[in-house]
Amino acid sequence: MMEFLMVFIISTVSAAVFTLFIRNILRSADIGDKPIVTEHSHKAGTPTMGGLGMLLALLLVTVLYRNNPYLVLTSLIVLTAAIVGLLDDLLGLKVKEVQRIIRNVSEGPLEVGQLVLKPGEEARAATDKAKRDVEALLSEGLVEVVGEAPIKNEVSEGEKILAQLLIGVFLVLSGAVGKLGGFYLGLAAAPIAIAGMVGAINAVNLIDGMDGMAAGIMLIASLSCAIFLGLSGQALPFLALAGMCAGFLVFNRHPASIFMGDTGSFALGAGYATAVMLTDTVYFGVLAIAVPVVSVIVSLLHRAGVIRLPVEPLHHTLHYRGMSERRIVLLYWLITLIVCALGLYMTGSIL
């Protein structure tokens, strides 16, 4: 028990220390976020790439507990994913284009792109259709330009998916994945493992949109997986992941003084997926991140035109409807905690 506690404590403390160090470096270099959501304009300049602090904490724990193969392989996958995320974050330091933010000054609703703006509401003209609509509405005096949003350079969606697929292939080639869901599948496990890797990375990346949301959810999920495993040697990767989330939350909770960026979200998603597949906790592992999974499904349905959100992803829609950021984050944490507690109770992991 003491070993498990020490892994969590070392990971937590080192993540907090490294994150503080990274934050100060980024501040001195004037490297900060450029929000594209109007309501988040007050966060402009907040250092990003805080995932580097989380990564350093995990690597430290891995060096100290290098005899645990589950932890070592998880760290290798995390390092690979973090490098991909870091490249995307570095590209994001340059602005690709500046998009106009407009406000509906008419007396009725207006269609701008896929959105329907009520009187007084604001939106960013992001798509080609939205830009054409704005030009027409401006000429009629129905909207006014109230600001501009810098759009960052980034790795294309196709390139991101390719990189995530390669990370999944790396895991499969390690030979550690063959049994999933209690069944030995051999090579048949490969496509499932790769799809799981891509899904987990994108799920964590999607919910990393509000202060403390991703780190808090993954802290709860990782600790729950460790408890599900009975705090055995297989639980060490989850305890290390939970600790680095806890340490990062010291500076990422509302109001956040640093963001994890794609460096952190890619690393966290890949690390969680790896730990789940290495320890064959697939069913419980997916259940534990039900909130991110549902968020991804909702976004996919929106993009497919099955449902229509005023703003994507779902948590931004809740914010758009008037719910405060802090309440949304607490709601997502609470749902995750309840789902994990029910899962642990139903599996007999807790009384």
Curated annotation (Swiss-Prot):
It is a multi-pass membrane protein. It is an enzyme of class 2 (transferase). Keywords: Cell membrane, Magnesium, Membrane, Metal-binding, Transferase, Transmembrane, Transmembrane helix. Its EC number is 2.7.8.13. Its cofactor is Mg(2+). Its main location: membrane. One of its GO terms (biological process) is cell wall organization. InterPro entries: Glycosyl_transferase_4, PNAcMuramoyl-5peptid_Trfase, PNAcMuramoyl-5peptid_Trfase_CS. GO terms for molecular function: metal ion binding; phospho-N-acetylmuramoyl-pentapeptide-transferase activity; UDP-N-acetylmuramoyl-L-alanyl-D-glutamyl-meso-2,6-diaminopimelyl-D-alanyl-D-alanine:undecaprenyl-phosphate transferase activity. It comes from the Archaea. The chain crosses the membrane at residues 2-22, 44-64, 71-91, 158-178, 181-201, 212-232, 235-255, 258-278, 281-301, 328-348. PROSITE patterns: MRAY_1, MRAY_2. It catalyses: UDP-N-acetyl-alpha-D-muramoyl-L-alanyl-gamma-D-glutamyl-meso-2,6-diaminopimeloyl-D-alanyl-D-alanine + di-trans,octa-cis-undecaprenyl phosphate = di-trans,octa-cis-undecaprenyl diphospho-N-acetyl-alpha-D-muramoyl-L-alanyl-D-glutamyl-meso-2,6-diaminopimeloyl-D-alanyl-D-alanine + UMP. GO terms for cellular component: plasma membrane. It is found in: Cell membrane. Belongs to the glycosyltransferase 4 family. MraY subfamily. This is Putative phospho-N-acetylmuramoyl-pentapeptide-transferase. It comes from Methanothermobacter thermautotrophicus (strain ATCC 29096 / DSM 1053 / JCM 10044 / NBRC 100330 / Delta H). The lineage of its organism: Archaea, Methanobacteriati, Methanobacteriota, Methanomada group, Methanobacteria.
